[in-house]
């Protein structure tokens, strides 16, 4: 049996060698579209013993279709620089086999990629219509790679969805979907998904996404997975999950450009994939990449948009950006400052460089960029070393242009100046006038409610920190806390504080919890002490910090109001015990309103394990607050 098999294989090889000259010089045989024919050794097949059996088989239906030899027409198609050169080939007596006609359409699409008017004229050209019919008649013989490029080209040329030729190509792609290589599917998805949505080819797009998801394990390079995540990941949640898995598998191969694209894509889709963000962050820290200015800016934006905190990455971004600050534009500086403020990452050298950038370009910096930087500085409570010069420039710019800003932006800017203790009377008057604050008095969108909350803080700043300010103010009705002000979920720290404090007070009328003040701030707890530090019933005495009076008796001489404030982890700058600007403003207002403050930061409370320790901690805090007041 073995000898017979060897003789038969030798015969077949000899026949194949005889046919070799008919094949392409490339020497890469290609299977035909038809069903493959298998060469077998069967005793029941007498014809297989004949030496000419292979040639007969080739004559009946070739097993391999060789690539045709390149001819002059192929070079003419490739070198064409005008559509007319392509169309002229139709009447030149050239042999346009199944692939050449499709290649002509592809080349026409390339030449007219940025000429929409010429595309419309081309579609009406009779020669182009003839070319489309020629392609349609040979569509089943067009090679796979050419087929997907052909479909992309027809979309790009703007053929109507009702075009018979376009529908024919789409149908051919659907028939071949299982046999197309993954790179062909990926190319089609990257280049044509948008066209498919616009053309109404939803069925083809859906089928394409299904095949991409089923065969996701065939992806073997980082470029493909990154491109697909960027271009089509948002179209299918399940496909995006698979692509993220593959990205995690290949992320070690990524360079800085691929890492940038992944992060920007996640930020654009607001997709906070923690495992992927951790993997990308690890490689950014561990690998000695050279990060360009544009990559650094995009990374800062992406991390800021996603709110993903990674200390070592932020340290590297800040250190690498610092040498680039002289070459940054005002727009880039504002964008970068905003990104770091979202991350609550205060790098003093970098922020000082940003402030110096503003001073160096005092005459040319645009007001919107200056406003963005002011809001960022207020968020992290940053005041430059040259603050007099910096804020003089801010006031100079705002003096003539503040009224021209959007009402909400006017409020944001003046609120930021209040946080940084730089607000002037004219700026307070500009946002507290009825014509402006009246737009935000009703219960509207969350954004409007946030703006109104800032108006309360601005009004409190005018009352408590600017004794010379004469008005206008918000109306008394606007100072009444809204029901939504106390709707927030109680945190574990607040709950434990309330329980511990209730045990210390002994009586419910000796303290209040979650007190909404007329200044726009909420106290976690409030107690009243007499001159001997004994608890007094709150509801019996006047409370000027409340919008609605609760008692009639004046405070006894030497009485003190204590406000308990819980400071959670998000209230602080990243990796710092410094409060964000918003909460620094709250402390200032409450101190100016006559309160003694009992600060309860999370990092101190977490160290207390027993109820006894928590009670002793609060007693000690209350004694210290009273003692500091007496020492003044």
Swiss-Prot record:
GO biological process assignments: mitochondrial mRNA processing; mitochondrial RNA processing; mRNA metabolic process; regulation of mitochondrial mRNA stability
Molecular-function GO terms, alphabetical: RNA binding
Positions of the RAP domain: 562-620
Stretch forming the transit peptide: 1-112
Tissue: Ubiquitously expressed.
GO CC, any one term: ribonucleoprotein granule
Keywords attached to this entry: Mitochondrion, Transit peptide
UniProt KW Transit peptide keyword: yes
Disordered: region residues: 24-53
SMART domains with a match to the protein in the record: RAP (SM00952)
Family matches, as InterPro entries: FAST_2, FAST_kinase, FAST_Leu-rich, RAP
Annotated localization: Mitochondrion matrix
Stretches with biased composition (Polar residues): 38-50
Primary role: Plays a role in processing of mitochondrial RNA precursors and in stabilization of a subset of mature mitochondrial RNA species, such as MT-CO1, MT-CO2, MT-CYB, MT-CO3, MT-ND3, MT-ND5 and MT-ATP8/6. May play a role in cell cycle progression.
Family the UniProt entry places it in: Belongs to the FAST kinase family.
Protein name: FAST kinase domain-containing protein 4
UniProt source species: Sus scrofa
Gene (name only): TBRG4
